[in-house]
Amino acid sequence: MGIESPTASSYIKHHLQNLTYGQHPDGTWGLAHDAKEAADMGFWAIHVDTMAISIALGFLFLWLFRKAAKKISADTPSGLQNFVELMVEFVDGSVKETFHGKSKVIAPLALTIFVWVFLMNFMDLIPVDFLPATAQWIGVTLFGADPHHVYFKFVPTTDINATLGMSLSVFVLIVFYSIKVKGISGFVGELTLQPFGKWMIPFNLLLEGVGLLAKPVSLALRLFGNLYAGELIFILIAILPWGVQWALSVPWAIFHILIIVLQAFIFMMLTIVYLSMAHENH
């Protein structure tokens, strides 16, 4: 675990802390060395690990699918081509069943969301001490510090900033397509004249406004909560004796694969449903 034997509490807190870069109270910029320093950096602090892993996985997704598209073959398809075709057909079928509007953007968007979120979720299967243990084994430091003293989270979807950022992007698309399809007057009317007519405009606005704002919040919290809980269980298992770790981690990892796929699917499907509702012109 480390040169100093940490307590269970400090071990858990360490593995739940992001690698944070921002401005210190004295005006200098740099990495936070503990949770308090990260909190003092305020709103504009950047979670470097979340940004790096999510961007890297995004490029991995693009590279894999581009590689499969360039080497497509009808005679002897490769394993990668079969996987890509399976993903495309699955997402395309889901969009056709759920989305009732006309748009060439929704299917590619749904595919991107599903694969990207799946890859980010899949990082939860990496052992919690893999990075510091590997760095220490090859004899290198991380950011100039002992590997076991560096904060780094592998799973972007256990960071509420990442899940909220994705859900807010979906929210922007919901508002954009609502206005594009229904017009500004139609969109405003949907918020103010339903479900109880013009005499109840304040109540309608409150009801519909809360419902609209709840969409990105629920999207973000559902994904974050499930993956954060899964990561926390892996960390708790890592505290246990070696033999018990294997007895618990393997079954939990197998079960967690279902959660990884399911949460990516739910995020994608809710996005399709919300955008389908935005395209409905009553």
UniProtKB/Swiss-Prot annotation:
The chain crosses the membrane at residues 45-65, 106-126, 160-179, 232-252, 253-273. One of its GO terms (biological process) is proton motive force-driven plasma membrane ATP synthesis. One of its GO terms (molecular function) is proton-transporting ATP synthase activity, rotational mechanism. It holds the Pfam family ATP-synt_A. One of its GO terms (cellular component) is proton-transporting ATP synthase complex. It is a multi-pass membrane protein. It is found in: Cell inner membrane. Keywords: ATP synthesis, Cell inner membrane, Cell membrane, CF(0), Hydrogen ion transport, Ion transport, Membrane, Transmembrane, Transmembrane helix, Transport. CDD domains: ATP-synt_Fo_a_6. F-type ATPases have 2 components, CF(1) - the catalytic core - and CF(0) - the membrane proton channel. CF(1) has five subunits: alpha(3), beta(3), gamma(1), delta(1), epsilon(1). CF(0) has three main subunits: a(1), b(2) and c(9-12). The alpha and beta chains form an alternating ring which encloses part of the gamma chain. CF(1) is attached to CF(0) by a central stalk formed by the gamma and epsilon chains, while a peripheral stalk is formed by the delta and b chains. Belongs to the ATPase A chain family. Key component of the proton channel; it plays a direct role in the translocation of protons across the membrane. NCBIfam families: ATP_synt_6_or_A (TIGR01131), PRK05815.1-1 (NF004477). This is ATP synthase subunit a.
